[in-house]
Amino acid sequence: MIETFRVGRYAMRYGHFVPRLYNYCRSLGFERQRMLPSRAFCSDESQGYPVMLLAQHFGTFPFDHGRVGGKVAINRHGPYAHHGEDLVLIQASHVGYNPDDGRFGVYQRHRTEGCRFGDCCGKLCGVLRWYEDEYAHACRQVQCGRLDGEPVFQIDNQYLDDSRSEGVFLRLDRMVETPPQPLTVLSTSKVFRAGHSIRERLGEACFGETPAPIGTALSPELFHFRRALAEGPEGHDLLEAALAPVMPALVTSPHPALDAARFVTQAEFDRTYRSILREPAFATKNVLFVSGLNIDVSPREGFPFPFTKFVPWAAYARLCDGRSFLLEQEQLVETLRRMPGENPDCLSFDGT
């Protein structure tokens, strides 16, 4: 699913995206004095510049639908609907990017000692960290080797204990001959004959005479995670719950933070779309919901704000004239790019 959300040529500067979005709203019949945008962004300060652009182009400060990590507070639909007639909800997860080394997930904090780089979305990266550490440990503790010339896996006893409450759980039926019967029992591990299909996939060279960690050959289809969700002041961790089904794909990705942000955007669009369908407060309103990804590039020297790009994912419109429709990524990007890049109604903050 994550791969269907393409980035590359679909990204556009926020300074181009917002006026095009405004002009698209006007083309749908939304009126300047009745429009109220709402943003569902993370609370990170890097998201401030997009909020400023929304205020400048729509002529009013946006309502706030955002929760940490870019989750949408769908329980705010009612209050939001009472504040405007033509409603424009923009949801975006965010991820940092350092163009100097091509890393996603990082952001330079210019107001810290030493202006050091750190996680861009601390919540998203914080959720990932436990899973990344557990995966890295499993990559070391599951080893490939040979016993009497036969390809085998030497598996730490920890990963053979299904009664554990959390951690990496191997899909043994995809790794070893079934039913799993150890060839040798060692002090802290057991040795199993490797299954035929995985031997073909990994190649005979992966099974050397001296046991070696399986490493990144421990691919997503060979394991899953189990973990009790953390309980915080707002209940269970909603972001972690959303990411849990795709954690094996995320921890094995070359860009975990990017893929996590893409998946959250996809999941939030689907969830919020369904909440809009059922929201009675929207029944007499024009509603446009746009979802995407904010890519934050740290401010360069001499510039106060980040260079932020928006990657559209999908949109849904439900209008008072009875029309309703979805725009998938390709359609949405093409629609926005057809819109004028200038907004004649754009505010001058000095003049307000």
For the regions a language model picked out, list residue spans one by one.
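Short, surface-exposed ligand- or partner-binding patches at beta-edge/loop junctions that are enriched
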Residues: I90-A92
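Short glycine-enriched loops at secondary-structure junctions
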Residues: F41-S46, V95
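Short helix-loop-beta junction
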Residues: L54-D64
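Short, solvent-exposed amphipathic alpha-helices that sit
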Residues: Q47-L53
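Divalent-metal-activated hydrolytic enzyme cores
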Residues: M1-M35, G59-T60, V68-V88, Y97-T352
